[in-house]
Amino acid sequence: MGQIINGKEVALKVKEEIKNFVNNRKEKNLQVPKIASILVGNDGGSIYYMGSQEKVANSLGVEFLKLTLPETCNDEDVIAEINKLNEDNNIHGIILQLPLPNNFDEKKIIKQISPNKDIDCLTFESQGKLYMGEPKFLPCTPNSVITLIKSLNIDIVGKNVVVLGRSNIVGKPVAQLLLNENATVTICHSKTKNLREVCKNADILVVAIGRPKFIDETYVNENAIVIDVGTSSFEGKITGDVDFDKVIDKCRYLTPVPGGVGSLTTTLLIKNACEALQENEY
């Protein structure tokens, strides 16, 4: 039987680092990190995530400002708020809750976020630096994947890694981070032929396709490390892209959902805000 990778335990270690950083600054009467989060409309998922981000930030001593705009506003209203935050030296990180309502130009609005405060790595400049191997901030979900793999003290160099999914939020950036670690990376998607065989040859399998319980035991080998990034509602429960009960008996390591990648993502977002504060001081 495989071992479970506990994302909550890894997150606790990072949280301790953040707490120490914030407490040290408070003792020296220095500024503490402050994050601004913008919500447009009333999407239930975005409201939940913003609340979760605020809760974690407050528990670590990081200030968190919530800005809520009605769906009846327009692109320029959102951009005006972003520009204010860009100019505010007391704000170190800006989060734009996505997706925006359909009547907004998401790309146009994202472009307005200062790269120095883009702790979610959304802007073209941030993503360009990532693909050039010189990221200012690491995108949080892909960084969670890498952090969990490294927590196993396993050398990624030369490993055969299969990334299932090619989204701009997870698939592509996690593949780039793995390339930066000198892994041999294959990206698979809905048009990939012989998908089961490709996945089965992976030393590390990262699954991010948004299809609950898609990966079963026939997709993995007994030495595989399987990282499940998916989160879907399935039969009234939050479920990953991997059929946990079937795969845990076949692979070497597996992240659960919930309790895996998602447990670490918000913590790493807040860590990015700490790094932004430090950079702005120099």
Curated annotation (Swiss-Prot):
Pfam families: THF_DHG_CYH, THF_DHG_CYH_C. GO terms for cellular component: cytosol. GO terms for biological process: L-histidine biosynthetic process; methionine biosynthetic process; purine nucleotide biosynthetic process; tetrahydrofolate interconversion. It catalyses: (6R)-5,10-methylene-5,6,7,8-tetrahydrofolate + NADP(+) = (6R)-5,10-methenyltetrahydrofolate + NADPH; (6R)-5,10-methenyltetrahydrofolate + H2O = (6R)-10-formyltetrahydrofolate + H(+). Homodimer. Catalyzes the oxidation of 5,10-methylenetetrahydrofolate to 5,10-methenyltetrahydrofolate and then the hydrolysis of 5,10-methenyltetrahydrofolate to 10-formyltetrahydrofolate. This is Bifunctional protein FolD. It comes from Clostridium beijerinckii (strain ATCC 51743 / NCIMB 8052) (Clostridium acetobutylicum).
